[in-house]
Amino acid sequence: MTPLFDLEEPPKRVLLVDGHHLAYRTFYALSLTTSRGEPVQMVYGFARSLLKALKEDGQAVVVVFDAKAPSFRHEAYEAYKAGRAPTPEDFPRQLALVKRLVDLLGLVRLEAPGYEADDVLGTLAKKAEREGMEVRILTGDRDFFQLLSEKVSVLLPDGTLVTPKDVQEKYGVPPERWVDFRALTGDRSDNIPGVAGIGEKTALRLLAEWGSVENLLKNLDRVKPDSLRRKIEAHLEDLHLSLDLARIRTDLPLEVDFKALRRRTPDLEGLRAFLEELEFGSLLHEFGLLGGEKPREEAPWPPPEGAFVGFLLSRKEPMWAELLALAAASEGRVHRATSPVEALADLKEARGFLAKDLAVLALREGVALDPTDDPLLVAYLLDPANTHPEGVARRYGGEFTEDAAERALLSERLFQNLFPRLSEKLLWLYQEVERPLSRVLAHMEARGVRLDVPLLEALSFELEKEMERLEGEVFRLAGHPFNLNSRDQLERVLFDELGLTPVGRTEKTGKRSTAQGALEALRGAHPIVELILQYRELSKLKSTYLDPLPRLVHPRTGRLHTRFNQTATATGRLSSSDPNLQNIPVRTPLGQRIRKAFVAEEGWLLLAADYSQIELRVLAHLSGDENLKRVFREGKDIHTETAAWMFGLDPALVDPKMRRAAKTVNFGVLYGMSAHRLSQELGIDYKEAEAFIERYFQSFPKVRAWIERTLEEGRTRGYVETLFGRRRYVPDLASRVRSVREAAERMAFNMPVQGTAADLMKIAMVKLFPRLKPLGAHLLLQVHDELVLEVPEDRAEEAKALVKEVMENAYPLDVPLEVEVGVGRDWLEAKQD
């Protein structure tokens, strides 16, 4: 492998880079923005492909781009490339960055006015070959296969090297006949017309029979069948033109002395600054620009106040983990703790990557250690794609190693790098919401919640018996036993033996789908389907909750300690893991019985506080729709009122079916539900569903206007944001693929609503936490739009009033926030209070 920046040896092989094609290809292949919202996917993709090639061919490199002036092809055939989509708005800006990268690397950059990059590359390739050099052409353009020879090969962007033998074996055409092949088949991407009606198979057959297009035309009267001959005769002009357009010129008047060609010394400082500016941390590492290890000044423990900490855990769950190592960094000095657990008491704060985890472990050990600054939280606010320290380190330059001191140094460096990038709104979110919230979550995780283990074990046994009964019924209907958990066996039973019509196929294997959605669509087709769905529901609850939950009770505390993930979702919502409490069914009887197993300690009660229809209230505020705001201000039922508007009735005449339809539309609008999906949900035809959605927007006209405005802002800025400035980048709003673009549109207008609701919940938690202390109450769980607390039995009424007051006044909206509060011995009882 050639050292990346070794310029000593004279070049024996030249690397020619099809710069324009490579840039255009990566522009659409990736989706990447900086934390400032600046699209950089083309620069990154180009750099990665180029870097891969430079590791093998680092000495003589020429990168060729199309010149702005029209080429002879444009002059010869005005339709040439005319059918291509217009140049994307951001392409020229990123192309300028690509060219700057090439210059910083010290590579020769070439543009020849009046000629296309293809012809410049072709001329250079053949000239280098004549001078006895090996040539590699880095491109994804198959046109270059015509240049292949013993000394000329094509290097694809994925690293595959293509030789004449490869082309012959894969396409059945030698390189010298490639132009003929392309002239017959045409190329829509380059508007090479070809012969209409001739595809690759026919072209191969013609070339196998006649050898070349030239010989084919000499013997045109002998071509069979007659219909094929007539096609060629009707498109002779196109065929001749296609030969000219497809052939890469190798005779341009270019003077290049390859033997004297040497790369300039790269501008390493400029390159480092360039990659840092674009936040290509992984490329800094791969280009070797992070520098060698600087001597670290070792200083004694404890560190000074404000130091950043790094630590290693034996496992990711801090309540269960052993603290293996603890270190701190301050102004480049490293402080190492010899007894990590004992050293926790010397710290004033947990500051650094995953600060919350260290705070949880410290609380377990009886040490009150508040988490403060965390570069991961800063990076997450800059771009919610930043969810893990490993990825953040790679993106912004560094490596999240298995060394506590290195982690501390990395935390210090990245925090100092990222913190100044926070805009005014994001800075407020960081200082007033996310940073103080990490302290709240640390205490919630350390506190945990008590479980009624015997109840869970009894329920598990009950489910096991019911699953056995369902299994027996399924076997009876199938006519024989089989493995219900085997998708292949289930597929055979349903579709081969019982003759059901499949609904969809799996993407990877193309097998008939037995997934949940497919089976739900088959409900009613056969009694066995309903039994299988029931069996699966019980099996999932048993394996996900009933059996694992008792094993997750901590032996020291006797409680369950879930982890709350602050940087896991694109909308800002919290998620939980180990276990994930978000997926416990809310409305099913079994889900409710699982909630009954979450209980209070003796002398305490659980308090459940749930925001009522918070996302619809947020939508009313963001859209400013007067009808929507009036419903909430007057305390009316939003679904009944929506139904009244949609059906043109007095609210008193709205029946349950109408209300259900309105409720489905109300929440469906938030998630971009299509008329097709609505028709399935409500069991109505497509036209009726379409009319429902239209009547909804007629009832709430400013909602539609807000959606359109949000999408337009997303396209213009590259991101959408919540009421408080939390961002989500949506580059796919500009996608040329309709399904991708429509999915991005749904995400784009849902995020401000869902994200604002998440922000309101977080603000409420931060405000509530210090006010619970005088009552002796504790926050335990945050699930969906709900908080669960543990309160002393004799302070329950005070706690109910306090929680309701704080949550409903988290932030002033144009409509009131409403919170339903209840208490009980267990979670279910509290919800039903």
UniProtKB/Swiss-Prot annotation:
GO MF, one annotated term: DNA binding
One GO term (biological process): DNA-templated DNA replication
Assigned keywords, A-Z: DNA damage, DNA repair, DNA replication, DNA-binding, DNA-directed DNA polymerase, Nucleotidyltransferase, Transferase
Region (Polymerase): 412-833
Keyword DNA damage carried by entry: yes
Superkingdom per UniProt: Bacteria
PROSITE patterns on file: DNA_POLYMERASE_A
Listed Pfam families: 5_3_exonuc, 5_3_exonuc_N, DNA_pol_A, Taq-exonuc
Signal peptide stretch: none
SMART domains in UniProt: 53EXOc, HhH2, POLAc
Entry's EC annotation: 2.7.7.7
Catalysed transformations (reactions): DNA(n) + a 2'-deoxyribonucleoside 5'-triphosphate = DNA(n+1) + diphosphate
UniProt xrefs under CDD domains: DNA_pol_A_pol_I_C, H3TH_53EXO, PIN_53EXO
Location of the 5'-3' exonuclease domain: 173-267
Function of the protein: In addition to polymerase activity, this DNA polymerase exhibits 5'-3' exonuclease activity. Unlikely to have 3'-5' exonuclease activity due to absence of a 3'-5' exonuclease domain.
Family classification: Belongs to the DNA polymerase type-A family.
Full protein name: DNA polymerase I, thermostable
Organism: Thermus filiformis
